[in-house]
Amino acid sequence: MSNKLLSKILPCVQCRVDYMMSFAVSPRSFGTLFPSSGQLCKRMAESVDWLQINCAAELGAGDGVLTRHLLSRLKTDAVLEAWKIQPKLVRKLIKLQEMDPRLQVVNKFAEKMTGKYDAIFSCLPLLSLPVMVRGRILKRACNALNDGGVFIQFQYSTVLEKTLSCFFEWTRSYEVVNVPPAWVYICTPHQKCNIRGNTGDVILI
């Protein structure tokens, strides 16, 4: 195998190894052993009109695979916040930030969001999170969107659709080229996010 080919393959292998090691340390924060596929990232990124996006957030930014897709579409004067708490993956995102000043890495829990965004992309494994935390994150996301803003969330099952409906109107699509296949939800807020769900989830208000 040529050195040129190895130089292309080894970084990809290292990314996968880093992701799996982070999964082993904190599986509840990831939801799956495998990072998102390029097709899933593309489907999520194509869910918004990028000409209208001045400030976006990515929750659960992982190893940066979706982050790169979003940056490739982001306007030159726009901002993308990447939220992540695992130290090793935060360091990887900071390296990406050093190459692209439009990226701002936020080393905080997603439920601490206080900004306003035109789009929020979420890779958080909502079903794996405690019910109260899940409710706080969805409420924060709902309230953090500007008028006309969109919340894009992918999940591996449809179990939480009733919970999503407490905050958002949504449509969904299915991406089979991913391990495992995933549902992508494109969500717009109800007029009032401060409601209490009638599902089994307790929604904080």
Regions found by a protein language model. Name each.
Residues 53-62:
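Conserved class I S-adenosyl-L-methionine
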Residues 93-94:
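Conserved SAM-binding loop
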Residues 12-48:
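Class I SAM-dependent methyltransferase Rossmann-like catalytic core
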